[in-house]
């Protein structure tokens, strides 16, 4: 839940040391945390395994015409805001509905209403009845390990070890 996420981020170094997730600089500043960036994950979509586009290996933006696209509300991060701005200005044939947060309720709604959810990642899925499909665009979002801006010695050593592995 959003409340759980806020609680975790507010207590780095006290109740929890690290968590993985997507972020932008404004998010880190607002939440008072830091991040070790591991990758730029593609921004893609998730849709029902029964959706008319589910058989495609990659979608074009024009494939979304006439569809309802679920997108995290404006202000969550600059990367999804850029997508929203492009869809609104260049592709009015796509209906956008806001979602507050990516959670089980949103994934269930995506599947049951046969919508398309703008999602993040390199494969797999978080819902058994949804399929993640890439979109032919260049949008990505930083993914990494979120932590306290002043991590403990143990956490610092862990972050350094992970950084070495990812820099190879």
Model region roles, listed by residue range:
Residues 30-43, 47-69, 156:
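Flexible hinge/capping segments at coil-to-helix
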Residues 1-3, 91-103:
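Short beta-strand-to-loop elements that line the ligand-binding cleft
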Residues 1-27:
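Central regulatory/effector-binding core of bacterial HTH transcription factors
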Residues 66-90, 155:
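Secondary-structure junction motif
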